[in-house]
């Protein structure tokens, strides 16, 4: 991690992170929803196949002291101090009642492949500028995170059971011989069993969402973030080169047509109507042709999506209850929740806002099927 916010994840992969706020998508009128949706589709189409990005939605509990500091209004020694105190008290009461002590943040992490930092830095800065301009056109408040802020985010996730303030300075590294990892690492990790893990005093479980529906429902993400518990929701998205995507779909259509011809030959030999073919072939053929039309004429791109959910809880019972809740949410939208058996460590690492995806479970989706990343604007937000 460097002070400017660039992080070297592997020997050749460098990433940066942008924190962004939400917009009132769920509360908007249908016309406004359509405009927001189309603008977000254009936002996603900006990414080419060389840029993999990660959308992170983090719900973490915070101490009352943290909330109190964030909304405190210091007195100024004038006749309005009474109003300031009353207003701060009202904010604290509303905050404690409104979100059950949860801080909800959203991040976009993007990365490029490069031989060294010198080659990666100008590309990352150009992409960052373009993304900030795209956010601005969407009417979304966004800001890039520097190295200290990215470490702070990681500290809050990895040490969520301690709720201690993040203490770090770049000047401390050389004299102490420590690295940035020493300031954010939890007290312990334990990946003994294949279906859950322990981080500090908390138990966790990493699952992936198996997307069976043709597209993601715009309410599913909102339901995840409305849970009153610590949860990390991550979408790893990799754009597929448009030419390769069209070639792949055409090959699939050719394979389906070949299978259809074979079935028709069987029908003729068996003496029944050759138009009677398996329903799956007819369905898949029509869907493949529709997908090809979307890619060629509707400004759609193909994306490979990995959908990960991390639940954290202090006890096994609470963790099981949270997993049951998440499973109910995904089933409501024609998806299934699958535990990452013996991949908990890789799954948790892929759920940190680092832009690294170590889970090779991907689902092909089009632009419009992927664009579900807005819910509603919270009244309270941490300052960007």
Question: At which residue positions do the language-model features occur?
Answer:
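Extended, folded cores of ATP/NTP-driven motor/assembly subunits in large transport
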Residues: 1-374
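Conserved small/polar residues in nucleotide/adenosyl-binding loops
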Residues: 375-383
């Amino acid at each position: 991690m460097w002070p400017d916010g660039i992080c070297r994840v592997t020997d050749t992969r460098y990433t940066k992170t942008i924190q962004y706020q939400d917009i009132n998508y769920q509360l908007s009128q249908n016309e406004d929803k359509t405009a927001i949706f189309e603008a977000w589709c254009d936002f996603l189409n900006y990414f080419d196949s060389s840029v993999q990005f990660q959308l992170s939605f983090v719900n973490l509990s915070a101490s009352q002291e943290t909330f109190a500091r964030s909304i405190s209004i210091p007195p100024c020694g004038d006749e309005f101090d009474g109003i300031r105190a009353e207003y701060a008290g009202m904010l604290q009461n509303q905050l404690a009642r409104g979100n059950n002590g949860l801080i909800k943040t959203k991040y976009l992490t993007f990365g490029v492949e490069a031989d060294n930092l010198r080659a990666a830095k100008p590309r990352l800065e150009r992409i960052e500028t373009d993304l900030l301009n795209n956010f601005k056109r969407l009417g979304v408040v966004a800001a890039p995170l520097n190295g200290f802020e990215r470490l702070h985010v990681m500290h809050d996730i990895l040490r969520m059971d301690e709720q201690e303030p993040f203490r770090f300075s770049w000047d401390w590294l050389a004299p102490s011989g420590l690295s940035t990892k020493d300031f954010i690492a939890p007290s312990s990790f334990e990946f003994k069993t294949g279906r859950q893990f322990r981080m500090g005093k908390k138990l966790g479980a990493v699952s992936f969402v198996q997307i069976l529906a043709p597209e993601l429902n715009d309410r599913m993400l909102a339901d995840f973030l409305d849970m009153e518990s610590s949860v990390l929701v991550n979408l790893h998205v990799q754009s597929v080169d448009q030419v390769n995507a069209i070639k792949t779909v055409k090959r699939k259509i050719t394979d389906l047509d070949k299978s259809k011809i074979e079935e028709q030959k069987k029908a003729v030999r068996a003496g029944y109507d050759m138009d009677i073919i398996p329903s799956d072939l007819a369905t898949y053929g029509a869907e493949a042709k529709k997908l090809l039309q979307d890619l060629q004429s509707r400004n759609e791109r193909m994306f490979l999506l990995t959908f990960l959910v991390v639940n954290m809880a202090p006890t096994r019972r609470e963790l099981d209850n949270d997993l049951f809740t998440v499973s109910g949410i995904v089933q409501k939208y024609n998806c299934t929740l699958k535990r990452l058996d013996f991949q908990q460590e890789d799954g948790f690492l892929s759920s940190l806002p680092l832009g690294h995806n170590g889970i090779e479970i991907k689902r092909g989706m089009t632009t419009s099927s992927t664009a579900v990343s807005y819910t509603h604007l919270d009244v309270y937000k941490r300052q960007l």
